[in-house]
C-alpha cells in the first residue's frame, strides 16, 4: 500500500480516533475531529455498525496511519513480534516505537511523526554522531539521537521543542533541549505508550 497523502484529518474522523496527525493544531482545539466528531461524507453522522473484522482492520489502520508505515513494513513488524517471546501485541507496539522517526518525534524535535520522517530522510538526524536517513531504523537503548548542528536553529525544531512545555515528554527518553539531543534510555512498556489502539484485535486479525 502506498503512503496516504490526502487530508489526514479525514483519516482521524473515519477511524474515530485522535492519531496526532495534525501536530500543533490538535492542541488548539480546532481539529476537524473535535469540530466534526463523525465520519466524513454525506452519511457520516450515522456510523454503520462495524463487523468484528471491520473492528480488527480499523485497529491495524490506526497504527499504520499514526506511525506512517506501509502494509509491508507492518507485516514485517508483526512477524518479528510473533517470533519474540511474550505478548505479541505489546511487542508489536514496542517495536514500532523504536523507529527512528518516532523517537525523533517523541524527543520533541518535530510536531508530528510525518515531520520527523521528513526531517530524517533529509539527513538532519544523527545517531551516535553519524547521519542516519532511514526512518525505519530501530533505535537501541542507550543510543544518542541528535539534530545536526546547522539544523538545530530550524524554526520547526525550535517550535516543536517549545510545545513540549505544553505536551510533556515520555519517560523513556532523556532530552537536552538546549543542545537538541536526547538519549533513548529504554524500550517502553506497552502501558506507557498512550495511543488509542487495541492491539489485541490486530493479533486476532492475523491469527485467522
Curated annotation (Swiss-Prot):
Gene3D superfamilies from the UniProt entry: Ribosomal Protein S4 Delta 41, Chain A, domain 1, RNA-binding S4 domain
Family matches, as PROSITE patterns: S4
Ordered alphabetically, the record's keywords are: Ribonucleoprotein, Ribosomal protein, RNA-binding, rRNA-binding
InterPro entries in alphabetical order: Ribosomal_uS4, Ribosomal_uS4_bac-type, Ribosomal_uS4_N, S4_RNA-bd, S4_RNA-bd_sf
CC per GO annotation: small ribosomal subunit
An annotated GO BP: ribosomal small subunit biogenesis
Pfam families hit by this protein: Ribosomal_S4, S4
Q: Does the keyword Nucleotidyltransferase apply?
A: no
Q: Which ranges carry the S4 RNA-binding domain?
A: 98-161
List GO molecular-function terms, semicolon-separated. Answer: rRNA binding; structural constituent of ribosome
**Known partners and oligomeric status:** Part of the 30S ribosomal subunit. Contacts protein S5. The interaction surface between S4 and S5 is involved in control of translational fidelity.
UniProt function note: One of the primary rRNA binding proteins, it binds directly to 16S rRNA where it nucleates assembly of the body of the 30S subunit. With S5 and S12 plays an important role in translational accuracy.
The record's comment on protein family reads: Belongs to the universal ribosomal protein uS4 family.
Protein name (database record): Small ribosomal subunit protein uS4
Query: What organism is this sequence from?
Result: Aliarcobacter butzleri (strain RM4018) (Arcobacter butzleri)
Amino acid at each position: 500500500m502506498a503512503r496516504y497523502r490526502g487530508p489526514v484529518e479525514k483519516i482521524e474522523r473515519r477511524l474515530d480516533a485522535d492519531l496526532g496527525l495534525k501536530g500543533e493544531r490538535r492542541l488548539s482545539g480546532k481539529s476537524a475531529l473535535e469540530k466534526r466528531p463523525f465520519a466524513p461524507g454525506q452519511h457520516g453522522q450515522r456510523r454503520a455498525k462495524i463487523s468484528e473484522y471491520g473492528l480488527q482492520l480499523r485497529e491495524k489502520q490506526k497504527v499504520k496511519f499514526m506511525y506512517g508505515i506501509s502494509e509491508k513494513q507492518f507485516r514485517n513488524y508483526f512477524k518479528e513480534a510473533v517470533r519474540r517471546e511474550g505478548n505479541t501485541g505489546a511487542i508489536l507496539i514496542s517495536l514500532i516505537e523504536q523507529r527512528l522517526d518516532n523517537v525523533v518525534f517523541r524527543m520533541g524535535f518535530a510536531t508530528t511523526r510525518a515531520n520527523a520522517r521528513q526531517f530524517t530522510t533529509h539527513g538532519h538526524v544523527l545517531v551516535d554522531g553519524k547521519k542516519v536517513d532511514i526512518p525505519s531504523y530501530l533505535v537501541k537503548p542507550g543510543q544518542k539521537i541528535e539534530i545536526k548542528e546547522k539544523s538545530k536553529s530550524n524554526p520547526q525544531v525550535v517550535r516543536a521543542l517549545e510545545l513540549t512545555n505544553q505536551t510533556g515528554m515520555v519517560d523513556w527518553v532523556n532530552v537536552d533541549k538546549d543542545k537538541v539531543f536526547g538519549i533513548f534510555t529504554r524500550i517502553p512498556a506497552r502501558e506507557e505508550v498512550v495511543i488509542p489502539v487495541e492491539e489485541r484485535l490486530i493479533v486476532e486479525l492475523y491469527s485467522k
